[in-house]
Curated annotation (Swiss-Prot):
The gene coding this protein: cmk
Enzyme class: transferase
Known EC number: 2.7.4.25
Protein name according to UniProt: Cytidylate kinase
NCBIfam families referenced in this protein's UniProt entry, alphabetically: cmk
Family membership noted in the UniProt record: Belongs to the cytidylate kinase family. Type 1 subfamily.
GO process terms (BP): nucleobase-containing small molecule interconversion; pyrimidine nucleotide metabolic process
Residues engaged in binding ATP: 10-18
Domain of life: Bacteria
Catalytic activity: CMP + ATP = CDP + ADP; dCMP + ATP = dCDP + ADP
Coiled-coil residue spans: none
Organism field: Staphylococcus carnosus (strain TM300)
Amino acid sequence: MNLINIAIDGPAAAGKSTIARRVAESHSMIYVDTGAMYRAITYKYLQEDKNDDFQALIEDVSLKLVYDEDKGQRVLLNGEDITDYLRSNEVTQNVSYVASKEPVRTFAVKVQQQLAAEKGIVMDGRDIGTVVLPDAELKIYMIASVEERAERRQKENEENGIPSSLNELKKEIEARDHYDMNREISPLRKADDAITVNTTGKSIEQVTDIISDLIDKVEA
């Protein structure tokens, strides 16, 4: 079997991370959560009292992704495991702003491309198929309704002990979509050769099966 890279892009809470992780497990591939990288840098930004000197911020950042058999992917920032802090409301509310900055984007893309160099990677984000891995053998553009995405985010927040309002989450997701699609650097958009997968009303297993079928066709 030839090793391939899979790029999964799409808006917030479309199911990218959950599906990417499941696909990687079922095909013995390595999952790379690029969103966690940007959240880690955002966490650092917040620790630095929102200092907007992003070049200086990046120069003081060392990111490492490690894989724990029980806990899955963990994110180490300057040697400290900060994974459990990455889904906080404060990080979520600031990550789009931080991720849009050129020094941050350049740093993260370089790390992501290094991770994918040996192939066998499933990577999800906003600009994987368009910027990070433009030569990926399979590109997926994952979408879902705002309503369902808000419900998923609320459930995720509840599991992490974070209270949230469904209506507020809808507004946040719509605002995030607008920001991501209209930012100057690496805006969210579907790659010309990406295949759209709508996850609305579908189970994790159903979406995983759809993508597995696409993988089989690429590898055939």
